[in-house]
Amino acid sequence: MELLNATLAKIYGLDKEAMVKAQAHQDILIKPQGSLGKLEAIVVQLAGIQGDAKPKTAKKAIITMAGDHGIIDEKFHNWPKEVTVQMLQNFAHGGAAINVLSRQVGARNVVVALGVATPMAADPNIINRNIAPGTNNMVHGPAMTREQAVKAIEVGIEIVNAEVKKGLDLVGTGDMGIGNTSPSAAICSVITGRSLEDVTGRGTGASDEQMKLKRNAIAKAISLNNPDAKDAIDVLSKVGGYEIGGLAGVILGAAANRVAVVVDGFISGAAALIAYTICPQVKDFMFAAHQSVEPGHRILLEHMGLDAILKMDMRLGEGTGAALAMNIIEAANRIQHEMASFADAGVSEKQS
C-alpha cells in the first residue's frame, strides 16, 4: 500500500488560474465565443491538468494491460484463453488495431502482461509483470487476494511513472483479456447499484443463452463474495481482474503526475470506476474516449459524470477508442496554439 498511498497524496485539483487563462485565450480567437463547443472545454481541462494555458499534447502513449479470468470456466465465452497471449504478441509486433490507430495519432504502445494464464516466451516488446496466471473463478470465491489487488494497482502506477520519465503529455488506457466484460459488469453493478440486466452486454458476441449463463454467473459471484461498494479494493479483489487493477493504477499514477488520461471502453471504464471510488478527484484528469456498445459503459460514465468524446459503436478494447479520441484532443489543443486572434487577423469583433 505504500506506493498507492504516496500516489494518492500527490493528487490535487485542477489549476483554476490556468483554466481561466485558457478560456480567455479561446475567447479572443477569430470565432464566436463558445462556438467550438467541446473542443474548448477539452483544452481548458487540459490547461487545468497541466497548469498551463497552452498545454502540450505531443508526447502520447497507450498502455494496454492484459489478464485472464477464471470465470471463463463457466463456459459461456466464445474464445479460448490462449487468444489473450496471442493478441499480446500481435500488440508487441505492430499488427493489431491498436497499433494501427496508435501510429495514426503518434502514440507509443506499452504492452503489459499482468495476469496472463498461458505461458509466453520473453519478448522485449512485452512488459511481463504477471502477478498470477489469471484470476480465480469468482463464481466460487474471490478473484484474487486483497494484497494481489493492491499489487495490480501499484504495478499500473509503476508503469505510468516510467512512461512519465520518458516524456508524457497524454496517456490512453487499453485492455486485453478473454472474459473481461464479466468482471467489468460486476464492478459496474456493485459500485453504481444498477442491476446486472442493465449493465451486462454481449462482450465478444454472446448468444441469448450465453447471456443468461453470463448474468447468472456474475450474480452468483456477487452474492457469494459480497463486495463492499464503498471499498474499491475489496470490489477489485472479489470480482475484478488484474488488468483492471493495473489500469486503475495507471489512472491514479497519471493524475499524480498531472498527466491527462484518455479512458477507452467498458473494461477501461471499470478500471476508471475503481480509481474514482478510491479517489474521486481523478475524474478531473480523465477524458472518456468513447461510449462503447456495452450497456454498462454508459452507466458507469454517467456515475462518474463523464461525457464521451466519440460514439462509434465500438467494443474492441485494446485502447482503440483512446487512440481515436487523442486525435480530437490534439486538434483542440492545436486550436489553442495556432488559431489567430481578432487582433492578429485584423477581424472586427462582435459589437456589444
From Swiss-Prot:
One of its GO terms (biological process) is cobalamin biosynthetic process. It is an enzyme of class 2 (transferase). Keywords: Cobalamin biosynthesis, Glycosyltransferase, Transferase. InterPro entries: Nict_dMeBzImd_PRibTrfase, Nict_dMeBzImd_PRibTrfase_bact, Nict_dMeBzImd_PRibTrfase_N, Nict_dMeBzImd_PRibTrfase_sf. Transmembrane segments: none annotated. The active site is at residue 318. Its EC number is 2.4.2.21. It holds the Pfam family DBI_PRT. One of its GO terms (molecular function) is nicotinate-nucleotide-dimethylbenzimidazole phosphoribosyltransferase activity. It catalyses: 5,6-dimethylbenzimidazole + nicotinate beta-D-ribonucleotide = alpha-ribazole 5'-phosphate + nicotinate + H(+). Catalyzes the synthesis of alpha-ribazole-5'-phosphate from nicotinate mononucleotide (NAMN) and 5,6-dimethylbenzimidazole (DMB). NCBIfam families: cobT_DBIPRT, PRK00105.1. Belongs to the CobT family. PANTHER family: NICOTINATE-NUCLEOTIDE--DIMETHYLBENZIMIDAZOLE PHOSPHORIBOSYLTRANSFERASE. This is Nicotinate-nucleotide--dimethylbenzimidazole phosphoribosyltransferase. It comes from Dehalococcoides mccartyi (strain ATCC BAA-2100 / JCM 16839 / KCTC 5957 / BAV1). The lineage of its organism: Bacteria, Bacillati, Chloroflexota, Dehalococcoidia, Dehalococcoidales.
